[in-house]
Amino acid sequence: NLYKDLAESAKKSIDISLAYDRTNQAVYFESPIKMRALLWHNTYQSENLFNYSFDLPCHTQYMPAPADFTNEDFEKLSRQEDFGFTFTESKAAIPVTAATPCFIFVQTGNGLKGVIRINSIIPESTEVIGGITYPVNPAITMDMKFPRNFSEQKIR
């Protein structure tokens, strides 16, 4: 809900967007272009949120990191000149019950490759304010790293 107070220029520079699937209790990493199209443009109202495919030049892509990717690998990334892995876009979903840390590989629309580390996942809940019960969306805390030669570039 913090998003609604952002300036239009700030909204347009968001490179990562998340979608929560209440049925499967999972958080999906999605392309910001896809989310803008689904939420703002009313063009794809009949499309299923998690099965739509975009092929646009500034399309952020994700893939789950291998199971053997560790915190040590993540910490070394900013000291490396390159992060060589074969990137294959795939659905990146994190169950809200997942053990943390967990990792997602990311490739920005400009081809920069890096890693997102999920540090914690807060499940959906409710809170009572003034005697009224309100839903609280799930949340994640995360950080990102890119190879050293990309660390000074703008991620967009």
Locations of the language-model features?
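Surface-exposed, beta-sheet-biased, low-hydrophobicity segments with strongly acidic/polar composition
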Residues: N1-R156
